[in-house]
Structures are given as structure tokens and as C-alpha cells.
Swiss-Prot record:
Record's keyword annotation contains Signal: yes
Induction behaviour: Expression is positively regulated by the oxaleimides biosynthesis cluster-specific transcription factor poxB.
Higher taxonomy: Eukaryota, Fungi, Dikarya, Ascomycota, Pezizomycotina
Species of provenance: Penicillium oxalicum
Pathway given in the UniProt record: Secondary metabolite biosynthesis
Purpose: Diels-Alderase; part of the gene cluster that mediates the biosynthesis of oxaleimides, cytotoxic compounds containing an unusual disubstituted succinimide moiety. The first step of the pathway is provided by the HR-PKS poxF that serves in a new mode of collaborative biosynthesis with the PKS-NRPS poxE, by providing the olefin containing amino acid substrate via the synthesis of an ACP-bound dec-4-enoate.
Protein name as catalogued: Diels-Alderase poxQ
InterPro entries named in the record: DA_C (IPR054499)
Keywords: Glycoprotein, Isomerase, Signal
Signal peptide positions (record): 1-23
């Protein structure tokens, strides 16, 4: 669902700080970060991409094009909070400044509960110390055999076409190095094309749920709001659906079908400035689809849960409270631990609607870890895929016949994290055929 915008995965912050301090102590000449130039004129290679993918984009589409090293504006930005604007349209169309940013995110879990995909596509200048430019893409994968692979890719240009029937986003570096996502206006279908030296192929996502706001209201609604927590906006174009993944990663096949979803974030400040923790769950079990997102604000220390449950594609429950109530719908979210184990092996999700007199319970059992990172001083995060089981519990505490399925879950804690104001570039690859890390630190 979400992914921390810190791309130094699998290495602790103290290691980065040590490299930085040693460089300063011994007066090492630190390399400047290269501003990678596109292979050719963006107008030329964008036309080639359109032709490769047979993209027929009418002149009536609104085109929003930004370059990775555009100067950030000093004036106030156009920051969209419209509840009826297409969820996938750019929310910062006039450009970026040093703090505001936005993200398009897609995730998937295989029907085995053992493979998974997490994709983040960013327009974000607030983490310039992570690498060159304002446009990056993060991709985390796990295979059934527990092999994981992660990458962060920085692109030269970002172009978003907002049309009457769809939104098309192109993050590109050349005619041979690009990512393209297309989301239909009704949010019923999304497609992501990958065409890079490392990853080629496509992912298709077919929604089985209605698009929704943080309060659980369905799109479109003129009275709903997109703000989920102070200065943080979040909506779900696709709370859940069927995903078809057909990729090749360094010539290794990555193909499966299962559960998928799509989300949007945009914020006035960077995530580390706005949040101390966040939790995310996406689940499909029989006729049920559950999406859950809960950030904890660094601004006021308050958690902002947003739970949404559908059955056969129809909304049956939503909640914005994580506290037991006799009036308000709420969600309880509890870790499950085996005896003498420090870490949880899964979670139990309890959804209660006092007004309806209804309750749903789902058990989540981990099968594979999608990624884990440590950032020092107790900060870090983990994501898992696995098997889910549950359904509605009736008044006599006899549940309906439990449904089985799969889930994705993520936990991130950055409460204690502080980041030096140095520029850091880190690239990682996990799993065969290459293992390694390259680190550059520069003032």
C-alpha cells in the first residue's frame, strides 16, 4: 500500500552517518551528485513511447509536464483539495517546492499469498538528499520462494495526461527507459507498463470495489474531503480488485494473479515531517475486500484510521475510529504472537458496527516478507504477504462459513528518526543474480 520514501533499504542509518562523518573527518573530496541528463529531447522520446504503446491521446486531454530538475517555485503552489477531481489527476500541477509532493501507488498479492508487488511513483522534491531529481520510482517484489528484489529508479521527466476517459502518467528517461500507468475515469481498470534495462512487462488491475474517500464515502461526493490527517491527503481509486502481473526482472519471470489495489497521496510536507507511524492492510477473502490505512500524525500525535469493507463489490462497513464504542463504527487491529516469539506472526482485524449490530473478524497469517528496513534508533518498517480467513460473526457468536483469501500488510515506525541534512544516494538490489549496495554521501 504505502511505502516509506526513504530508499536506503536494508542498511541502517548509523552506517550512512559513519560514512558521512569519516568523509568530513578525513577531508575526503566528496563527489557531487550527477544530474543525469535524458538520453535525448523529451519531446522526441515521448513521441516514441506513445507509438510503442499505441497511446492515442486526443488534443482535448490536459497535459502536465515537469522535468526532474525544474527550479522549485518560491510562491504558493496550486494544491488541489477538490473531492470531485479525478483521483489520479496531478494534485500539484504547477510544479513542486521543497516540501510538497505526491505519490501514485499500486500493490498486489498473489493467490498463493507468497508473492507480492509494491510500486510507488513519485513527484517529490522534499527528499532531494536521496538522489538526483524530483521523480523516482520504487519497486519491491517477493517471489513464492521468498526471494526479494527492490530497486529505486530516478527519471528525467514526468508527464501526466488527464483525459475525459482516463489518466495516463509517463515517468521516463528515454525511449528505452520508462514507466507508464493508465487509470480509467471510472477507476475500474489500471495498467502499468515497465520498460527498463532491469524490468519489462505489464501489470493489469481490475477493480471490484468503488473508489472511496478517507471517511468511507464513495466517489464522487461534493461534501467529502480528501484530507486524511493534518496536511496529508489520501484517497483510494481502487480499494481492491483482481491483479494480473506479467513481468520479467533481469530475465527472471515474475508472473501471477491475485489481489491488487491502487492509492493516491499528496501532502504539504514530507512524510517524515508529518507522520511517526503508519499501518496498511489490503485483504481479499471470498466475497470480501478490506482496505485499511492508519497514519499517526507527528503534528498532534493522533492516529487516523480509515477502514473500508465491501462484500460482492458493495460497501458494508467503514470506520474512522480505532476505539471501542457503543455508537460509532470502529476497527480493532491486534498482532498475533506465538509463545516465546518476539515478533508477531500475523494480525487479527475486528470490524464492529454498533448501529447495524454487525461484526466481522479476519485473521491474517504471514507467509513471506516483502521487505524490511532498519533506519537506526528503533526506526524501520516491514511488509508481508500471506493468507487471510474470516467473515461475519453473528449475534450468537457463530460466524458465517469463513472465507479464505490473501492479504498485504505494512508497518512503519519513524518516530525516532532523524536524517542528516546531507545528500545521500543509495541503490540496492536483492536476490539473484546481483547482491550489493553502493553509497555516496555528499554535502
Amino acid at each position: 500500500m504505502a511505502r516509506i520514501p526513504l530508499e536506503f533499504l536494508s542498511i541502517t542509518l548509523p552506517v550512512l552517518l559513519l560514512a558521512y562523518c569519516l568523509a568530513i573527518e578525513y577531508e575526503v573530496s566528496l563527489p557531487t551528485i550527477a544530474h543525469t541528463s535524458p538520453a535525448s529531447n523529451p519531446e522526441e522520446y515521448l513521441q516514441s513511447i506513445y507509438e510503442q504503446l499505441n497511446l492515442d491521446l486526443p488534443s482535448t486531454c490536459t497535459v502536465n509536464h515537469l522535468s526532474a530538475f525544474d527550479n522549485t517555485p518560491t510562491s504558493l503552489l496550486n494544491f488541489s483539495t477538490s473531492p470531485v477531481e479525478h483521483f489520479d489527476a496531478p494534485k500539484l500541477p504547477s510544479g513542486l517546492n521543497a516540501t510538497a509532493g505526491e505519490q501514485w501507488a499500486f500493490d498486489g498479492t498473489s493467490s498463493s499469498g507468497r508473492s507480492g508487488l509494491l510500486l510507488g511513483i513519485y513527484r517529490d522534491a522534499s527528499y532531494a538528499f536521496l538522489g538526483p531529481g524530483n521523480f523516482r520510482l520504487s519497486l519491491d517484489l517477493v517471489w513464492d520462494n521468498s526471494t526479494t528484489w527492490s530497486t529505486v529508479d530516478y527519471l528525467s521527466s514526468s508527464t501526466v495526461h488527464t483525459c475525459t476517459d482516463k489518466v495516463v502518467g509517463i515517468w521516463s528517461h528515454s525511449a528505452d527507459h520508462y514507466y507508464v500507468f493508465t487509470v480509467t475515469a471510472d477507476a475500474k481498470h489500471a495498467r502499468i507498463h515497465f520498460h527498463t534495462p532491469d524490468v519489462v512487462g505489464a501489470v493489469d488491475l481490475y477493480s471490484t470495489t468503488p473508489a472511496r474517500y478517507p471517511d468511507g464515502a464513495l466517489f464522487p461526493s461534493e461534501v467529502s474531503v480528501t484530507q486524511n490527517a493534518p496536511m496529508l491527503h489520501w484517497v483510494e481509486p481502487i480499494p481492491g480488485g483482481l491483479i494480473d502481473v506479467d513481468l520479467k526482472v533481469k530475465d527472471t519471470p515474475f508472473r501471477w494473479t491475485g489481489l491488487g489495489g491502487h492509492e493516491r497521496w499528496w501532502s504539504a510536507k514530507g512524510w517524515l515531517d508529518l507522520m511517526t507511524h503508519w499501518e496498511a492492510v489490503r485483504l481479499m477473502a471470498g466475497p470480501y475486500v478490506l482496505s485499511f490505512w492508519q497514519p499517526t500524525s507527528r503534528v498532534n500525535g493522533v492516529a487516523y484510521p480509515s477502514a473500508f469493507l465491501t462484500k460482492y463489490g458493495e460497501k458494508v462497513f467503514s470506520a474512522v475510529s480505532g476505539k471501542v464504542s457503543e455508537v460509532e463504527d470502529y476497527i480493532l487491529y491486534r498482532p498475533v504472537r506465538m509463545e516465546k516469539q518476539a515478533r508477531e506472526t500475523g494480525y487479527e482485524v475486528d470490524l464492529v458496527s454498533p448501529a447495524q449490530g454487525r461484526r466481522w473478524v479476519f485473521g491474517l497469517e504471514y507467509r513471506n516478507q516483502e521487505f524490511e528496513f532498519e533506519l537506526g534508533d528503533a526506526a524501520g518498517g516491514r511488509a508481508y504477504v500471506g493468507r487471510a480467513k474470516g467473515g461475519e460473526v453473528h449475534a450468537d457468536d457463530k460466524p458465517e462459513e469463513p472465507s479464505e483469501g490473501v492479504f498485504f500488510i505494512e508497518h512503519v515506525d519513524v518516530k525516532a528518526l532523524t536524517v542528516p541534512r546531507a545528500y545521500v544516494v543509495v541503490s540496492f538490489e536483492f536476490g539473484p543474480p546481483i547482491h550489493g549496495a553502493d553509497i555516496w554521501v555528499a554535502c
